[in-house]
């Protein structure tokens, strides 16, 4: 059976819509005809306590766990602790996200035992794009299936993070424990995210502090300082774009106060290359180079961890030309410059639509999971489920 977990706070209308969507899902594997699974709602101290029916239209049982304070993402921990022990997997959602179908559940049952989590392909219908964030082996919390026992063994999310980058911390601990994170392109989740009323200063403050914590905890000793600088540069640029300089400054001050308190459990270089996506960029670009060598490229649609793509190209002795607006010669190919799955998929689909088969312009994605999507109904998981040396 399966357990769906979603935290909520002061959004009863949105919660009701999500429960309705979950109740419309068909085809849950059943432990008994009357018991297809459960939904655990964690009410993070709503002003008016959240309510829900005891069962949804498809028979999913529903329980509401009320918390006295807003525990942020760590409220998911109490839900997993209360999940039905028959559930091998727990599906993490938000109160505004839900799977489009149940086909992913059958594939979860065939996942290799060292796959601890399976990331979904998360769509934002209201914004006509996919969810940003994450990496090939870092999931996004509003659309991921996690082995219940692994989550419990690793003590779940660190409450100190509250929200933002807590998934990076948990994914790092999974990798250190010998597990992998996979990506299932047919595990589709809709996230009805609302951009309004978001305090970007608060968001930037947490992003700066929490991502700094992650690198302080897990980056190899000879890369730690550079990785913290990389995070600082990225979020300074975002703060300028989002007019959230105050939040950036507050986050930086908080990071400086707390960074020495973070326990160091550094990864080996090999594990860290998986964590950052460098292993996957190397694999994809080396494969493309072997198929048809190239000497010059331009980076397009640049985003998170673009530095690993530049490094993988440098290792191939490939020259990166300036932006397409430059009057320089046409590059041999265009390379998508983000390691975040959602933006990478969006860019690849958009660019290949503009440059159909037979076009002289070659488009490369820095992750083979993007270009080797298994057939519908396949049991194959991609991304982190492929071992990379």
Positions of predicted regions on the chain:
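Active-site donor/metal-binding and catalytic loop motifs
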Residues: 177-179, 184-202, 213-214
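A short, conserved alpha-helix in the catalytic core of glycosyltransferases
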Residues: 143-146, 150-155, 160-188
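Short beta-strand-to-loop acidic/aromatic patch adjacent to the donor-nucleotide binding site
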Residues: 87-98
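Glycine-rich, basic loop-to-helix element that forms the pyrophosphate-binding segment
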Residues: 64-85
């Amino acid at each position: 059976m399966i357990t769906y977990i979603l935290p909520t706070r002061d959004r009863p209308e949105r919660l009701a819509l999500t429960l309705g969507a979950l109740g419309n899902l068909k085809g849950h594997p059943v432990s008994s005809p009357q018991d297809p699974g459960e939904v655990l709602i964690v009410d993070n101290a709503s002003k008016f306590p959240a309510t829900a029916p005891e069962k949804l239209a498809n028979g999913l049982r529903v329980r509401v766990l009320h918390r006295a304070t807003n525990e942020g993402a760590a409220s998911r921990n109490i839900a997993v602790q209360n999940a039905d022990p028959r559930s091998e997997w727990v599906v993490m959602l938000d109160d505004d996200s839900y799977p489009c179908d149940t086909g992913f559940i059958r594939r979860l049952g065939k996942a290799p035992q060292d796959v601890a989590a399976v990331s979904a392909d998360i769509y934002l219908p209201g914004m006509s794009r996919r969810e940003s964030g994450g990496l090939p082996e870092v999931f996004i919390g509003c659309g991921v299936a996690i082995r219940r026992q692994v989550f419990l063994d690793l003590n779940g999310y660190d409450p100190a993070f509250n929200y933002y980058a807590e998934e990076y911390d948990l994914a790092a601990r999974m990798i250190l424990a010998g597990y992998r994170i996979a990506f299932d392109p047919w595990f589709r989740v809709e996230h009805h995210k609302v951009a309004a009323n978001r305090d970007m200063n608060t968001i930037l403050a947490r992003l700066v502090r929490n991502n700094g914590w992650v690198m302080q905890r897990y980056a190899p000793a000879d890369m730690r300082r550079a990785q913290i600088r990389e995070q600082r540069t990225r979020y300074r640029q975002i703060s300028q774009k989002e007019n959230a300089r105050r939040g950036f400054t507050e986050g930086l001050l908080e990071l400086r106060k707390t960074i020495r308190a973070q326990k160091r459990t550094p990864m080996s270089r090999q594990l860290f290359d998986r964590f950052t996506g460098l292993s996957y960029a190397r694999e994809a670009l080396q494969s493309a180079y072997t198929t048809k060598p190239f000497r010059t490229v331009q980076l397009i649609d640049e985003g998170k961890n673009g530095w690993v793509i530049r490094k993988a190209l440098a290792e191939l002795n490939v020259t990166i030309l300036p932006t397409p607006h430059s009057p320089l010669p046409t590059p041999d190919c265009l390379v998508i410059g983000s390691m975040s799955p959602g933006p990478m998929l969006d860019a690849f689909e958009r660019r290949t639509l503009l440059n159909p088969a037979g076009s002289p312009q070659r488009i490369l994605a820095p992750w083979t999971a993007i270009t080797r999507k298994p057939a519908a109904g396949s049991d194959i998981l991609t991304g982190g489920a492929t071992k990379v040396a």
